[in-house]
Each structure stands twice: as C-alpha cells, then as structure tokens.
Design a protein with these regions (language model features):
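Short, basic/aromatic recognition patches
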Residues: 2-25
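Short, solvent-exposed aromatic-acidic interface loops
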Residues: 60-65, 115-118
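Short beta-strand segments
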Residues: 21-62, 70, 78-82, 90
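Short acidic (Asp/Glu) patches
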Residues: 61-64, 74-80, 126-135
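A generic structural signal for nonpolar/aromatic side chains embedded in well-ordered alpha-helices
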Residues: 18, 69-70, 114, 150
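Structured helix-beta-strand junction loops
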Residues: 20-21, 72-73, 144
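Charged, gly/pro-rich active-site loop segments
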Residues: 2-8, 87-167
C-alpha cells in the first residue's frame, strides 16, 4: 500500500475532522492571477438529496475581494488543517465550485448558524440560543453579506498520525 493510501482519511474521518475544526482557508484566483487566501468560519450542512456530503458553507461581505474573484472564476480550493509536528499533521483539501447566494432568506439564517457554532468555546456544550445582542448584530450584517456554498468536486485528505511516528 502506498504512503498516500496509508494516510488517507475515510469519509467518516474527514467529516468528523471538518466538524471538529473551526477555520477553513479559502483560496480564490485574484485579479492578477495570484492565489488569494483568506480564513473563514464555516458550518457543515447536509447535501441535497442524492449527493455525498457534508457540504461546507460560509459567509462574507458581498464587496469582498474573494466575492469579486469568484465572480470571474467560481472555483475555490479550501483547506482545513491541524497539527504542528510532522507526525501530527492532518487535513482536508477540497476543490470546489462556489455558488454565491445573495438572497437574504439564505444569508441571514446562515449567519445565525455560523455565530451559533462559534459562540460555543471548543469542547463546550453548544449554547441553546445566541445572546440577543449577537443575534441582532448578525441580522444587521446579513444585508451586507453573501452566502458561499462550496460544492465539492475533488478532495484530498491526510492524517500523518496513521504512520505511527514513521515515514
């Protein structure tokens, strides 16, 4: 078995990893052809019927550089990674087509969902609802934001912990 196959995550492992991490790096192609990389908060949602999942969603300001980039080329590469030492490195890279959604009825609930996820410290019980001032802030921001639906086309995964400290 190749090293590549040895470190590859299963579908369940990759889904659990994505659910447990909190920041995705989103790479789009900038106006001068250089990659434009930015961190994003995200949530995972079930995919539409008949599709494999989960599907990653985020939001950003509608006038952001990444949205301008996606208007020219709707492709993005996403990476979620963890670990510091080589034998601890693990991650998921997704090549995606991005659907930029402008409808407030899509954007506002997504913003609430994102803030609900991040209102809870890592490892703590989820909050039952957002504090009212946070919910109001999200509602105000929603009119300036867009939803980003990342439709996965290809994936690569790695988990160097599977090598048992060797390479």
């Amino acid at each position: 078995m190749s090293r590549r196959e040895q470190i590859k995550m299963s579908e369940d492992e990759a889904s659990a990893f994505l659910a447990g991490e909190r920041t995705v790096t989103c790479a789009t192609q900038g106006p001068r052809g250089w990659p434009h990389l930015m961190p994003l908060w995200y949530v995972l949602r079930d995919p539409p019927a008949g599709e494999q999942g989960p599907r990653l969603w985020s939001w950003t300001y509608g006038v952001s550089q990444k949205v301008n980039n996606l208007g020219r080329d709707p492709r993005a590469t996403l990476q979620v990674e963890a670990g510091e030492l080589y034998q601890e490195l693990r991650g998921v890279m997704l090549e995606c087509e991005v659907r930029v959604r402008h409808e407030l009825e899509t954007v506002a609930p997504l913003g609430q969902e994102i803030f609900h996820r991040y209102a809870t410290p890592r490892g703590a019980e989820p909050v039952s609802e957002l504090p009212p001032e946070v919910a109001q802030m999200v509602e105000k921001q929603a009119v300036k934001r867009v939803a980003l639906e990342f439709v996965e086309l290809r994936r690569a995964t790695w988990d160097h912990r599977k090598l048992g400290g060797t390479y």
